[in-house]
Amino acid sequence: MARGARPARGPAGVLQAPGVHRGDPGVHRGARSRLWGVRRGAGSRSFSAWSSACAGDPRRRGGEDMEVKDANAALLSNYEVFQLLTDLKEQRKESGKNKHSSGQQNLNTITYETLKYISKTPCKHQSPEIVREFLTAMKSHKLTKAEKLQLLNHRPVTAVEIQLMVEESEERLTEEQIEALLHTVTSILPAGPEAEQQQNASDDVAMDEEDPA
Amino acid sequence: MFVLVEMVDTVRIPPWQFERKLNDSIDEELNKKLANKVMYNVGLCICLFDITKLEDAYVFPGDGASHTKVHFRYVVFHPFLDEILIGKIKGCSPEGVHVSLGFFDDILIPPESLQQPAKFDEAEQVWVWEYETEEGAHDLYMDIGEEVRFRVVDESFVDTSPTGPSSAEAASSSEELPKKEAPYTLMGSISEPGLGLLSWWTSS
């Protein structure tokens, strides 16, 4: 086989299993099981070569190790994770049968606990429109991405909380600005489950639909 | 609190699952492998976000299963430094206050990062903030089950993968591994105004 585009194939090609070889696995298209049938006599050799290739030098194991391409590709708000987990739960409920297999137990545990945690925060009542409105309103305050994310996740109602989340807030924000920021946050973001009782005292027109009797 | 991590991995689908849609099988396999597990230097993996690319699937000699290289994004719990989080007190010990988020338990607030002055009440095994006002000292107890707001000041990853046979001599000298280390721990601090039990700071 003199096709230059396939470096793994050569006189000793049968001993190197495709895909295990470092290099471009895309060179091989699809399962080549029929080729192995052709080389009958070499069958046993190729098997042992493959298993030794796998068990041996990790450098030769090409695409078989898990690799992290970017450990910080994007920050997610609690609302986005809440949405994702709720959708996942719905999907799994519909497909029914294999939820309880031992392999799925970890996923069940982590989704249940994380959902439980986020449901107790104000993020539960948010929506994509609210988040968009919030971020547009935040543009004028000149905060960093991390600060805006914390405000979105926690919905602070007091000045002391703002000071915790915004770095060097005494230097960057005056008292009126902090008040304005608080007002934006509390008016755009809906209150959390426990904060509803505390909201009664304030004169903000409540965004939440539930009636806290 | 949560970040998206882009990863690449080879997923093995056994032949008896070939009738299922490949995407569903891969989703399940990835979640089975990563959900609720801590990845070294990455964080606690929660669930799969999406699959960005599927490369060709190969069948290797001697193994009937298909192997597919998958590029995907995973939701990982990995708070950034100085992030404010709210958790529940799980317990107190002389090492500090242990806080839990429900899905993540290994958060410690060491004694020096508590609101000062603080003392450990041996009888009740609880940390106390001795808050001074003009009236006198109030003892504010940090009881179990209370919600606290804290700042993440440090994180540490421990590689808990099993050691090879070469260290067997060292391991056999001690009966068992001394203690099970948590693969991912966070250090918190509540020494600023606004931090600590939520009940301390709600205006009444």
From Swiss-Prot, chain B:
A Gene Ontology term for the protein's cellular component: RNA polymerase III complex
Gene Ontology biological-process entries: defense response to virus; innate immune response; transcription initiation at RNA polymerase III promoter
Matches recorded under InterPro entries: NA-bd_OB-fold (IPR012340), RNA_pol_III_Rbc25 (IPR013238), RNA_pol_Rpb7-like_N_sf (IPR036898), RNAP_E/RPC8 (IPR004519), Rpb7-like (IPR045113), Rpb7-like_N (IPR005576)
The keyword Transcription is assigned to this record: yes
Family matches, as Pfam families: RNA_pol_Rbc25 (PF08292), SHS2_Rpb7-N (PF03876)
Key words of the record: Antiviral defense, DNA-directed RNA polymerase, Immunity, Innate immunity, Nucleus, Transcription
Chief site of localization: nucleus
NCBIfam families from the UniProt entry: rpoE
Protein name as annotated: DNA-directed RNA polymerase III subunit RPC8
Species of origin: Bos taurus
Gene encoding the protein: POLR3H
